[in-house]
Amino acid sequence: FEDSKKTFVYDISEDAWHYRASYDENNRLTFWRYSHVTFAYGKQYVGTTGVLAYMDEKKFTEHDDRVILKMRRGAVVTSNDQPFWIDHLRLICNNGQTSLDNSYTNLELNPRVSFRYSWDGATWSDYEDSYMGRVGNYEWETDLWQCGLGRYFTLEVSTTEPIPFCIQNLQISWSPTSMF
């Protein structure tokens, strides 16, 4: 749907729909620019204007090295509709993971991950950046502190770094409150 600037894709391996996007020449997020997809010779081929490329699980940019946004938005977290305070979040991910081809860019040496959150589902906080740890530092902790107070909390985690990104778990430290 080029007019809506969104592309929805059904992933057979995940048995779920998901949203794909590309950055345009002005670095704005827009619809996924690959409009033709086919599976042949053991590869998933994609086409866009004047280009035939294939999807590679070990490449984390598009065919012309534009970054790929990897984003996950969680479900709403609530405490029985009562207000609560989030003191601390810890993202459990592939901290300190090495590059798949043993070549390291400056970004891969300490890749950045961005958080933003919403307490009402409509307005979002500013992005807050954290890091995933230098290569080999598997004990690195990716944390977000003092997320605020509310009744309904939604978290979004994203990165555009050219690395594998796998969220394994999220720990939330929260406290009930009688404020409001």
Q: What is each stretch, according to the model?
A:
Residues 1-180:
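Beta-sheet repeat architectures centered on beta-propellers
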